[in-house]
UniProtKB/Swiss-Prot annotation:
Record-given protein name: Coenzyme PQQ synthesis protein A
Keyword terms: PQQ biosynthesis
Cross-link Pyrroloquinoline quinone (Glu-Tyr) placement: 15-19
InterPro entries assigned to the protein according to its UniProt record, in alphabetical order: PQQ_synth_PqqA
Example GO BP: pyrroloquinoline quinone biosynthetic process
Superkingdom classification of source: Bacteria
Gene: pqqA
Functional pathway: Cofactor biosynthesis; pyrroloquinoline quinone biosynthesis
Its biological purpose: Required for coenzyme pyrroloquinoline quinone (PQQ) biosynthesis. PQQ is probably formed by cross-linking a specific glutamate to a specific tyrosine residue and excising these residues from the peptide.
Family from the record: Belongs to the PqqA family.
Pfam families xrefs: PqqA
Disulfide bonds: none
């Protein structure tokens, strides 16, 4: 299980990347 802060940061970055890519 990953650390909570790291998991949130990775997920946030992933979502942002997808958002920019979809733009």
């Amino acid at each position: 299980m990953w650390t909570k802060p790291k998991f949130e940061e990775m997920r946030l970055g992933f979502e942002v990347t997808l958002y920019i890519s979809n733009r």
